């Protein structure tokens, strides 16, 4: 994983964790090393499923 994230500007290549002052490295709720705002759609509705939204405190997309 270290090699995979070595070119990622959000990733500290030594620790493979977010650089100081950054929130995240990747994920559906991460953009430019920061968490997306709460309420940002991270998974569009399909069929009977409703949209899923970012929480503003995680790079993961919570499932409804």
Curated annotation (Swiss-Prot):
The GO cellular component terms are: extracellular region
Q: What is this protein called?
A: Disintegrin VB7B
The UniProt function text for this chain reads: Poor inhibitor of platelet aggregation. The disintegrin inhibits the adhesion of cells expressing the RGD-dependent integrin alpha-5/beta-1 (ITGA5/ITGB1) to immobilized fibronectin. Inhibition on alpha-IIb/beta-3 (ITGA2B/ITGB3) is low.
- Where is the motif Cell attachment site annotated in this sequence? 46-48
Q: List the disulfide bonds.
A: 10-33, 24-30, 29-54, 42-61
| Stretches assigned to the Disintegrin domain | 1-64
Keywords tagged on the record: Cell adhesion impairing toxin, Disulfide bond, Hemostasis impairing toxin, Platelet aggregation inhibiting toxin, Secreted, Toxin
Please describe the quaternary structure of this protein: Heterodimer with VB7A; disulfide-linked.
Q: Which Pfam families does the protein's record reference?
A: Disintegrin
Organism's domain of life?
A: Eukaryota
InterPro entries of this UniProt entry?
Disintegrin_dom (IPR001762), Disintegrin_dom_sf (IPR036436)
Q: In which tissues is it expressed?
A: Expressed by the venom gland.
A Gene Ontology molecular function term of the record: toxin activity
Q: Which family does it belong to?
A: Belongs to the venom metalloproteinase (M12B) family. P-II subfamily. P-IIe sub-subfamily.
């Amino acid at each position: 994983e270290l090699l995979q994230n070595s070119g990622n500007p959000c990733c500290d290549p030594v620790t493979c964790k977010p650089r100081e002052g950054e929130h995240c490295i990747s994920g559906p709720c991460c953009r430019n090393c920061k968490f997306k705002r709460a309420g940002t759609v991270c998974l569009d509705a399909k069929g009977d499923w409703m949209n899923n939204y970012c929480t503003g405190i995680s790079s993961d997309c919570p499932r409804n």
